[in-house]
Curated annotation (Swiss-Prot):
Family indicated by similarity: Belongs to the FliR/MopE/SpaR family.
Protein name, UniProt field: Flagellar biosynthetic protein FliR
Underlying gene: fliR
Function: Role in flagellar biosynthesis.
Compartments reported by the entry: Cell inner membrane; Bacterial flagellum basal body
Species, as recorded: Salmonella typhimurium (strain LT2 / SGSC1412 / ATCC 700720)
Amino acid sequence: MIQVTSEQWLYWLHLYFWPLLRVLALISTAPILSERAIPKRVKLGLGIMITLVIAPSLPANDTPLFSIAALWLAMQQILIGIALGFTMQFAFAAVRTAGEFIGLQMGLSFATFVDPGSHLNMPVLARIMDMLAMLLFLTFNGHLWLISLLVDTFHTLPIGSNPVNSNAFMALARAGGLIFLNGLMLALPVITLLLTLNLALGLLNRMAPQLSIFVIGFPLTLTVGIMLMAALMPLIAPFCEHLFSEIFNLLADIVSEMPINNNP
């Protein structure tokens, strides 16, 4: 019969507990993995499996579990995981923003519904673009790249009481501008053409006031918008590939800035 001593239990707890906090924090905020449609047991099981794979290669931390240092260490691991997952959400937020811009120009701003995944009121076109971005993210193996980047953080920023550089979180805050910038770049061709169409309808209304511009304008704008979206579809995949690559490079820069360099 195999007997396990209390020292062995304590060693395993120190070895697996701290990495598990960082992994679960990432899963709770990362794209796709944080969807409410995924059961919590599946998320917990995935986090435990990832931890069982990566933890044996990490040195055990001997911080007492019931201490102020352990509380600070737990907050640090959770903060690192949340920062990684939250940054990756910027790419999907940019695609959703593009869908909101296009839907607004198409006259679909009122076509909203409660998203079952996030329980937020979201435009239909934004949700379609978001689902397309999720499929492309899986196609490009983005989830594997994200887990690989998480593993790298354990070597770049080992589990310990060392503080995290605040410059990394400043870079994370500045990266929020990528949402509006990339969303506008993706939607700009459709917005420009639909704006031109609306200007033409406005001139037509001035030249022929007897025409009911509301009866003509909405079906025409909606039809042209659907045609433009069909033309835009082949360009979404390379755009998302470039966007995901940009976000992963940003994540790598943020992770590299997290350790505090004590060298003069």
